[in-house]
Amino acid sequence: MQVSDGRGRSVADGGLGRWLAAVAPRSARGELGVAFVSDSRMRALNKKYRRKDYATDVLSFPGDILGDLVIATGVAKRQARDAGHSYQTELRVLALHGLLHLLGYDHEDPDDKGRMARMETRLRRKGGLKAGLIGRAVAPPAAASSESASRAAAIRK
């Protein structure tokens, strides 16, 4: 797993990569990139790829091997405070949720919401998380798609 600041500079992940590898389902094979970005950058990405003008918490961009996750650090810090757990725990919740989107799960599809919720519950329990993202009353993140090259360029802007 490669973790960056959204501008191509590597940053420490605080054990997020090891944790995610331990809880990920077997179908999650390949390379995963994670970018931590500001709320303003996330708002711009959300507007560009989903036509929603607000900073969401996590976006998932499927790629050739697995894909990329973009996590808004400000949103994550606020959600951690509101949920009563640590920032690191919130990053795990968001990374797990985003990974499920990369694997094809979609809670915005009524036919798939229950399937995604069940998988999220199973994996978060495996990873020692008490709460998942689907069960919370927050603005729902969703998968967004783009070509790998334009995606990487968009994240670094």
Where is each model-derived feature located?
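An acidic/histidine-cluster motif and surrounding catalytic segment
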Residues: 1-92, 100-157
